[in-house]
Amino acid sequence: MSSNSMDLDTEWVLSVVVPMFNADNKLGVCLDSLEKLKNHPALVDLLGERTFEVLFIDDYSSDNTYATLQQLCSKYENWSLYQTEENTGSPSTPRNIGIEHARGDYIFFLDGDDEIDAVGITQALGLAMLRDHDLVRGSVEVNYWGEKRTIVDRIKVTDDMTAEEMIVAIASGQSLNCSALWKRDFLLRHDLRFDPDTRMGEDLVFTSAAMNRATSIGYVDSPLFHYMRQPGGGDSAMHYYSGRELRELVSSWQRVENSFAERGLSYLQLHGDRTINYALRLVIRYLDPTNVEDADLEFFAEFFSRHQGTLRDIRFTDPHVNDLVAELSRGDLKTIKEEIKPRLLIAGHDLKFMKPSVPLLRKKYQVQIDEWPTEVLHTEAHSKKWLEWADFIWVEWLTAASVWYSERVRPTQTLVVRMHRYELGRSYGDQINRDAVSAYITIAPHCMEDLIERFEFDRGKVRFIPNFYFTESYTRADSKDEDRLFKLAIIGAVPQRKGYLKALQVLAKLRESDERYTLAVMGKSYRELSWVAGDPLEQAYFAACDSFIEKNNLTDSVQNLGWVNTYESVHEYGFVLSMSEHEGSHVGPGEAFCAGNQGVFLPWRGVEFVYPETSVFEDVDAMAQYILDMRNLEDFNRVAKSGQDYMRDNYDISLFVDRVDELFRNA
C-alpha cells in the first residue's frame, strides 16, 4: 500500500474516510462538500481549535483519480491519500485502510461520488460528544440526477430508548448503509472491519455486526450525506451479476440475520421486505441468466427455502419479486431459471420488425406480446394484465400504444419506444408522458435528429439501435452465377415515394447497352391497394409508370412477383435497388448484401450512415453506369462479399439482442 500522508501531532475530532475508484469524472461534488466543511460556522464553533481529517483511499484506479487526489492533498494539511497495491473490487479494503490510519475520535465513511452534509455531520458530532454514543445515524438526502431531492431513512426515536429499541427502529426504518458516525475506539475495541471477500452487502454485514455490539446509539433527524443517484443504472458499482454475487447476497443476509438473532431479533422481519425487494430487482435487471451455474442458483434458492416461513408473510412491492421469491422457496431449478429472467413486454400495432427477434430474446428474457389490432384499438384488460407483469416494456412505433403505456407505467418499470419514421408526421410524440419514457429508439442516425427536432425530446434519451437481419439465414448466391448480374429487383414499389419510376429508368438505360437486364418487382402491385385508386396523385404516378414501360418496350423485362420470401429468393437478383425519396433504413437492399449480392442506393437523406457509401449514387445515370461496370463477375463478388461482411458486423440479429439487452439493463 502506498500513501501520501503527513506526520501530524494534530488531534482530529473526525476522520472522513473516502474510498475511490475510477472517480476522476465524478468526484467534484464530493470534494466541494469536503472543502466547504472546514469553514462551516457551526462545525467551527463545535470543534474550536480541533478539526477533522480526510483520508482518501484509492482502490488502484486506472484513470487519473490518484493523480487528481494527490494534487489536492498537497494543498490541505488534513487531507491524506492512500492507495491499495492492486484493485480489490469493493470498498471494503479501502475502508479498512481508512480505519487503520484514522486518528479522529469519530469516523465517517463517505462514497467518492456523494457529498457530506455539514449541518447533519455537525449535529451528529455534537450528539456523539455529548452522550458518548458508539454510533450516531441520520437520514439521507437522495439527489435524483440533480433534478429532484428527497429525504429518506427518517425515523422516530426518543431520548430514553435502549440500544435494542434503537436497533429495532433503525432496522425497521432505514437501509443499513455504513455512512453513520462511528466512534473509532468502539470499532477498534471490537475489531470491527469490513469483509474484503464480500462485494455484495458488505456494508449491511458491517453495520449489523457493529450495532449488535453497541451499547449506546444516537440519531439526528438530519441527512449526514447526499446520495447522488445517477442515471443509467448508476445505483450499483457493478452492472452485471454472476453466480458469485448471488452467493454473496444470501451469505450476507444470513450473516445479518445471525447478528440480529443474538439479540432475539430477525432482520428479515424488520426490513426484509425492502432489502430483498431492492436486491432481487437488481438481480433481475443485472444477472445474465445464460451465464450462471446451477450450483450457484441452488445455493441462492436454499436461503429462501430455509426462511420461507418468514418470507411467506411478506408482500413485496414488486410483482415479479413476489413470484420469484415463491419459486426460489419451492426450489425447482428449471422454474427458477425462467422466473429469474427479466420480464419483457413487446407492445404495439404492427410488430413485424420486432417479432422475429423474440426467440433469441427469450434466451435472456421472459417475453410476452401485446399486439394491438390497429394503431388505436386494443383490449385494455389484456394490456393492463401484461403491464402489471412487465419489468421492461418495448413499444413499437411512436403511436397510441406508446402514449397509453407512458400514462400507466410504474416508476420501477423501464419503458422504451421505438420510432421508425412515419411517426414524425403524427402527433403522438406531443401527447406522450415524457417523464415516463426511459429511452426513444431510432433505427438510423439521421432519424435521431429528425425525432429531436420534431418533438424536442431530451437528446440524452434518444438512442440509435439499427434494424436487425438474420444475416446467416439467407439462401446464398452462387458466386459462379453470372446471370444474376443482369437481374435487378425492387422490394416494395408502392407508394410513389419508393421511386418505382426511377427503377424503370435505370432498367431502360441498362437495356440500351445490354438487353439481358430485367427488373423484378416484389410486393403488392398498386392495383391491389384500394387506397391508391382513391389518391389522384398516386394514381397518376403509377399510370405514368405503366406508360413508361409501354413506351420503352419493357413489358417483357418487368416481372411483378407479388409477395415473396426474400430469405429464399433475393439471392437470385444481383442488384436490389433503393430509389426512395426518403427512408428510415430500407431493409430490402440490405437483404441483398446478406444473400451475397448488392444493394444500390440513390442518396436519400442519411443513407450513407446506414449502408456503405460506395453503394450510394448521385442519380439514375450514375447507378446505371455502376451496374454496367459490375459485369465482371470477380469485381461483383468482391463488392458483394464486402457488403455481406458489413451487414454481419453491423446488423446481425445477435448484435440487436445485445444492444437491446444493454439498453434495458442500463436504462
Model segments located where?
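Glycine-rich, basic loop-to-helix element that forms the pyrophosphate-binding segment
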Residues: T84-A102
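Conserved donor-binding/catalytic core segment of Leloir-type glycosyltransferases
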Residues: W12, K480-K498, L504-R511, L519-A520
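Donor-binding/catalytic cores of nucleotide-activated saccharide
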Residues: D114-V220, F225-L246, V250, V256, ...
